[in-house]
Amino acid sequence: MQENPISNSLSKTDSNEASNPIRSLMPFRYGPLCYAIVDVEIGLTDHRIHDIGALRYDGAIFHKASKEELLPFLERVEYLCGHNIIHHDAKYLFEDRQIPWRLVDTLYLSPLLFPERPYHRLVKDDKLLSDQMNNPVNDCEKARDLLLDEMARWDAWPEQKRRLFTALLRDQPEVDGFLDLMGAGLKNCDLREQIATVYRGRICQNVELEPLIEHYPCELAYALALIDTTDHRSITPGWVLHNYPSVEFIIKKLRYTPCLAGCTYCNSQLDVHRSLKSLFGYNAFRTYEGEPLQERAAQAAVEGRSLLAIFPTGGGK
């Protein structure tokens, strides 16, 4: 049987790797895998296909402008991968035709698997950083390298976290193909309990998770991915917020809405006195004629109330 170049990115490189245009992705533990990576160049004014590049699992390369000739090249392929393939490349390549492949989109995976600043070296906003302009084969190579890193990062996650994100993202078309590629089976789990356990101390313990799980599973996944970061300058990419505007609302619910009962997270992270000490080094807020104006303004801000704070001279602006 011919060796399949898609594999585990952690495995050792074999002697044939240098001659294979598709770098070994790791002996794939879920069995033989037939895949291709595709990229399409579209004209800015005529919105027509100007060039197509594709890399196949057996090392074959396709570089033509004919989508009709691409189809025989993909004949034995099971997984069709690319960067923004679902809502861009596939739309131009196959139009309304039924797609027989499982689509794996590296774009939607990147903010989930690499949410930490400085993010992934191959991605800027929603674009791949390419070495060559208007070369779809080169873009396929970059998409392949990004996919490799995404596979390795997924494998490096703790099993409980993988189970949690699988439960949230199964049946989401932008991610489902990747989960299938990684053999991520859906197991019975109490998602609310899983999230509360994995993110204990990093989100409000009393937040109502059930409505978020039911109505915003994808947005919740992006929010949790950002919460996992340790660099406070890490942000959700603008294109994610454009496609999933509820991400900001969910982060506010999880992290910036103090619960009435009080919990470990809210009592420590949303306490204005603790923050005053940790951020500014002061033990107490300044008062003005006995009135704690600073404290009231800070508390109103933490509670998300609309406010306009006007301090008199000497009042602690």
Task: Go through each PLM region and give its residues.
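Generic beta-sheet signal
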Residues: Y35, E78-L80, R305-A309
